[in-house]
Amino acid sequence: MFRDVLKTLPQYLIPKHGITALAGYFADVKSPRLKNFLIRNFIRKFDVDMSEALIEDPKSYDCFNDFFIRHLKPECRPLSQSDVICPVDGCISEIGKIERGQLLQAKGKYYSVQELLACDGQLAEQFVQGQFATLYLSPKDYHRVHMPIDAELVSMTYIPGALFSVQPATTRVVPKLFARNERLAIFFKTKIGPMVMVMVGATIVGAIGTSWHGDVKRAKKLERFDYSERFPDKIISQGSEMGYFKLGSTVVLLFANGEKIQWDKELLAGSKIQLGKPMAIIT
C-alpha cells in the first residue's frame, strides 16, 4: 500500500490537464518521422500484437491516435452467444452487486451511483440494487468499446473532472476515483431495463468519443445530450462499436435490474477478458 501511495502522490502535484493536452497534440501529429517513432516505440514497450490489427503495418497509420484506436480483424474477436458479452479488451477491476447505491472501487473504497453519474437521486435510485462491472483497459489493449447487449440509446452526459491515472495502484489510493475523473455517462434502454456505460478519462487520454458523436469536446461544464426524440441510430445491436478512447482508461458498466443479471462465476477482480467473451446471463 505504501508503494501505491508513493506512485500516486505526484499525480496530485503535476498539471494533469496540461500534460494531457500536450500528449493529445503530439498524438495527432502526422509527421511521418514523429508518428512512426511514437508508434514503433509504443509497440515495443507494450508488446502490442499487430497481427490482430486490420492494418498490420504500423507505418500505414496517419498519426499515433489512428494507430491507438486501430480496428481489429473481425475473426480475432468472435462474439459469443451469451446474453451479455464483454464490451472491451481489458481486465476486470471489480464486479458484483451495487449495495445500497454504492460501487466497490477497490478494497475498502466505495463511491456512489449518484456521484458517478452526476445525476439526481431519482435516477440514481434505479440502480440502488443493480449490478456493475468495472473494466480497465491497459495501454496495449484494443481501445474501441462495443455493446454488451442490444440497446436503445437514450442520452449521454459529459462530466468534467480530474485526470488521475486509472491504473490499479491509483484506484487503491485515490478516493472516489471514477467519480472524480472526467467521464462520459451513456444511458440506454434494454430488454431488462436501464443500462449505463461510463467511459472514464485519465491522464494522457486525449479524447473520449462515440460512434454517433465523434470526439466529445472537453469542457468546463457538465453537458447533456438527449436522444429521446427521433435519432437515426438509436438502436445499437450487441457487439456493435459504440465508442473509443484515445489512450487507455476504464469502462464502468451498470445494470439497474440486478436480479436479472447473473455474472459468469469465472469473472473475478483481476481476471483478463476480451471483447465478445461471455459476461453474464439474463435470468
Swiss-Prot record:
Q: Which residues form the signal peptide?
A: none
Which cofactors go with this protein?
Answer: pyruvate
The record's free-text note on cofactor binding: Binds 1 pyruvoyl group covalently per subunit.
GO CC list: plasma membrane
Q: Which Pfam families match?
A: PS_Dcarbxylase
Q: Where in the cell is it found?
A: Cell membrane
Name the chain's protein.
Phosphatidylserine decarboxylase proenzyme
High-level lineage:
Bacteria, Pseudomonadati, Pseudomonadota, Gammaproteobacteria, Legionellales
The protein's gene is named psd
